[in-house]
Amino acid sequence: MKTYQFKPYNVGRWVIWSLFAIVLIFAPLVFTSNLSGTMLAQMGIAIIACLSYNILLGQGGMLSFGHAVYTGLGSFVAIHALNAITAGTSSIPVSLLPLIGGFAGIGFAVLLGYVTTKKSGTPFAMITLGVAELVFAMSLMFSEFFGGEAGISGNRVAGQTVWGISFGPQIQVYYLIAIYTFICVALMYAFTQTPLGRILNAVRDNPERVEFI
């Protein structure tokens, strides 16, 4: 009869994740100024962006100079979706806008990544740099989408409120970002434990051997 063995319960890992959640929950209650709230929200966004880049460079060993392109393009899609909600042409809840931006970023990454991943090493880095410069040049030409030098602004207090949450108070925006930050960090960690995540480590350490596997 076949028996299954499970990994031992990792107490330290649960402690770290619990502390991470506690910090996210209580940070705005400790740092209560408007500046602190803005900085905490931006830190949550930066955590997601930096850890995703760590998967690319730290786990896969691929130096990219165009990683911010996908974050930026996804953000522009999200702000256009927010303006559509404000105009009444869309009924998407504001709380789902980060998902829209995230999936838009994935779409652009698949489209541009199909070209950039044809090479590796220094050629890969130079291609990603070229993609970043191309998108920068496009931002000046397509002002309808990018908003030109002024960018695009929106009103986050739009659409129907859910459970009385309007995202008018800054703390509500922070907790929305904190929830997405925790979920994204957990998903990225889980990805590194999958076979595909392990293959990224192998590609980083010995790409020639991986080609023969």
Language model regions located:
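Transmembrane alpha-helices and adjacent helix-loop boundaries
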Residues: 1-213
